[in-house]
């Protein structure tokens, strides 16, 4: 088997014009693996540390030369000579080398860049697609490959846009499609329908970080209304063909045990119970199938009530709540909180820990949703990971911006390659709603 002969990190620029880490891993057989690390806007307080330089004279303090140096000077010497297929060992060595709970010594961006680049190098060396290679090295057993339902973020609010919409993401899920290809087509058509609707109403059609529109709408409900119109303009039926998903990012709205929603006409300040009632009211009006981070990451008592009241009607996703961390996630499972976990590779900082979080979800009867970050690159590995691990759902933005579309295009290629060995589950992908 091929061994690592060289690891090289560098500073590149992400989709928001900020620096990020890219890593090359070169093997003895000449194979190269290259990976770039994403970055979030709204981040959970317990996420693995993204190491930044802090030099205000350079990229406003957001440079990543320290992380790059850690790749080249600390990590590379420890991994050179190792067999590339020993991914778990490679990740364990880096985790031990860092020695902290949140990778605050080496930086999660340094560790993750190396981890993902090793996986790509291994797949290339073994002449396997990344999705197949990941299954092989982690012994993932499944007869079928599942293509994920795209949760397409077509209206951006909150931290992802400069407007008065409180909720961070309004997403559409094309559930009636027979294949991923058709689902993506449906999503693109609704996206274009929404642009037409917004233009006719005199709203701006500039896009946010994740490629969705960021109009200055009057309320959160109005965002759902214009999406309903867009679905009809595209020739689809709301609730049958297209259902909705929300990312509230409620931690960003939470202060002094209360939630403030500036976009609401009545009762801008809400308690946990008020928020749960607010979601209940939205469910009466709109076909919402999933709500992510509906309450703050620190409001576990509220989450318990939210789960008890709405788990039979909704997929309740923990993002900031669980931060792809198996220790935190296990605590949530034991306490009966949420019924789904968002999977972000850079929240935890290694491929092996990411796989462990997905496997923990399945054992507990939770769903797992593969996700991008608001700061992305041309790297499309999360598309492969969604298929490798059969997450059944993926969040990777709207139907614009190449940093988002490259993931969708990779899924198109994977579906074509797999043919009859793959399936698209549609509404059945939301299997934790019980």
Swiss-Prot record:
List of residues binding (2R)-2-phosphoglycerate: 168, 344, 373-374, 395
Record-level Gene Ontology MF annotations: magnesium ion binding; phosphopyruvate hydratase activity
Subcellular location: Cytoplasm; Secreted; Cell surface
SUPFAM superfamilies named among the record's database cross-references: Enolase C-terminal domain-like (SSF51604), Enolase N-terminal domain-like (SSF54826)
Pfam families (UniProt xref): Enolase_C (PF00113), Enolase_N (PF03952)
Class in the EC hierarchy, top level: lyase
Main location: cytoplasm
GO BP, sorted A to Z: glycolytic process
Highest rank taxon of the organism: Bacteria
EC number of the protein: 4.2.1.11
Cofactor(s) this protein cannot do without: Mg(2+)
Residues that hold Mg(2+) according to the record: 247, 292, 319
Alphabetical UniProt keywords: Cytoplasm, Glycolysis, Lyase, Magnesium, Metal-binding, Secreted
Active site: 210 (proton donor), 344 (proton acceptor)
UniProt xrefs under InterPro entries: Enolase (IPR000941), Enolase-like_C_sf (IPR036849), Enolase-like_N (IPR029017), Enolase_C (IPR020810), Enolase_CS (IPR020809), Enolase_N (IPR020811)
Pathway(s) this gene product operates in, as recorded in its UniProt entry: Carbohydrate degradation; glycolysis; pyruvate from D-glyceraldehyde 3-phosphate: step 4/5
GO cellular-component term (any): extracellular region
Disulfide bonds: none
Comment on bound cofactor: Binds a second Mg(2+) ion via substrate during catalysis.
HAMAP family assigned to the protein according to its UniProt record, in alphabetical order: Enolase
Function as written in the Swiss-Prot or TrEMBL entry: Catalyzes the reversible conversion of 2-phosphoglycerate (2-PG) into phosphoenolpyruvate (PEP). It is essential for the degradation of carbohydrates via glycolysis.
Family named by the database record: Belongs to the enolase family.
Name used for this protein in its record: Enolase
Gene: eno
